[in-house]
Amino acid sequence: MAGRGCSCSPGHLNEDNARFLLLAGLILLYLLGGAAVFSALELAQELQAKQRWEERLANFSRGHNLSREELRGFLRHYEEATKAGIRMDSVRPRWDFTGAFYFVGTVVTTIGFGMTTPATTGGKVFLIFYGLIGCASTILFFNLFLERLITVIAYVMRTCHHQQLRRRGTVARDNRKAPRKGEADSLAGWKPSVYYVMLILCLASVAISCGASALYTTMEGWSYFDSVYFCFVASSTIGFGDLVSSQNAQYENEGLYRFVNFFFILMGVCCIYSMFNVISILIKQTVNWILRKLDSGCFPQCQRGLLRSRRNVVMPGNIRNRCNISIETDGVMESDTDGRRLSGEMISMKDTNKVSLAILQKQLSEMANGGPHQTSTSSRDDEFSGGVGAFAVMNNRLAETSGDR
């Protein structure tokens, strides 16, 4: 965020580090706020439940002439049995093949309900290596799912955009004719907005949750609200384990129900994972906006310094040394805006954010590679030049990630 020549920016904190530290601080505040809210909502209920339990324990001890120590010892044995999968009600075996398949599914998807855990040393050792490969493979599967989902959504939205251009007369209706330059630019540079993609993923997640909740209400006997709650906890891979589907000993049409349950959980995890990654783009935009606001005080003098250094073709290193946020964003606003207008790229943001976010993302990639990309260095295969994980998947596929790392 700071660089030389900017007295209001302490140190040499570049854009990446500033974003990281700001996001870490915001997450810490988010955790503190969440802890305060949940403590206010749940603490009283916990104290009341504990008081009721102590009263029941005392009444049972007096009624059956048992000491509290003996009774607590018996309850500890019950807790150990519960951890081993023993329940008072009739439940299906935890470690038959279908139960083990359900378990490994919760392992590789990182849901981890916790109702089934390995008890043997061999099982625990095998879980470490099995989870290492399984979790990595499943994350790759989720990223590939996200890539194909974004591709399909972009294709559909691009087709709709093309139809709108045809209705407006911007694109020729005769597809046999070669498109004019303006027509090609208006289509080639067009990318779907992250907001529309997020809306589509949100609707898909809601549809899956509603359908699954109706199924769980019928088959598990849960309330509809508890079913919706379970769908989110499972699909987001939080996996508390307070509610777990497909655990009863018998179901009507058991085979079909277990298959549909597996399908709903898998599709729910894929959609929620994709939606989380799209939301992360919006969070990144917010962090960038905060950084620009924090750095706006030193914008005028830093921009003038950048423009002077850009005119000096003999010393391009001045640009890289002045790694102030305003330098990396606003200093090249005019030239990049013209380029984006010529390409016809649509970015669904207000004018103040339209260019600056894309410039931030472009400059991040340039700074990571030691400066603007040159012809001699562009041919090198850099595994991380396009980003890591889901950010790499969505790189240049959405309007708001054009030029992203």
UniProtKB/Swiss-Prot annotation:
K(+) 4 binds at T110, T237. The channel currents are activated by arachidonic acid, inhibited by volatile anesthetic halothane, partially inhibited by Ba(2+) ions and only weakly inhibited by extracellular acidification to pH 6. Residues 237-242 are annotated as: Selectivity filter 2. It is found in: Cell membrane. InterPro entries: 2pore_dom_K_chnl (IPR003280), 2pore_dom_K_chnl_THIK (IPR005410), K_chnl_dom (IPR013099). Residues 110-115 are annotated as: Selectivity filter 1. It catalyses: K(+)(in) = K(+)(out). The chain crosses the membrane at residues 20-40, 125-145, 194-214, 263-283. One of its GO terms (biological process) is regulation of resting membrane potential. GO terms for molecular function: identical protein binding; metal ion binding; outward rectifier potassium channel activity; potassium channel activity; potassium ion leak channel activity; protein heterodimerization activity. It holds the Pfam family Ion_trans_2. It is a multi-pass membrane protein. K(+) 1 binds at T110, I111, T237, I238. Residues 1-19, 146-193, 284-405 are cytoplasmic. K(+) 2 binds at I111, G112, I238, G239. Keywords: Cell membrane, Glycoprotein, Ion channel, Ion transport, Membrane, Metal-binding, Potassium, Potassium channel, Potassium transport, Transmembrane, Transmembrane helix, Transport, Voltage-gated channel. PANTHER family: POTASSIUM CHANNEL SUBFAMILY K MEMBER 13 (PTHR11003:SF57), POTASSIUM CHANNEL, SUBFAMILY K (PTHR11003). Each subunit contributes two pore-forming domains 1 and 2 which assemble to form a single pore with M2 and M4 transmembrane helices lining the central cavity and M1 and M3 facing the lipid bilayer. The transmembrane helices are bridged by the selectivity filters 1 and 2 that coordinate the permeant ions. Up to four ions can simultaneously occupy the selectivity filter and at least two elementary charges must translocate across the filter to convert it into the open conformation. Belongs to the two pore domain potassium channel (TC 1.A.1.8) family. This is Potassium channel subfamily K member 13.
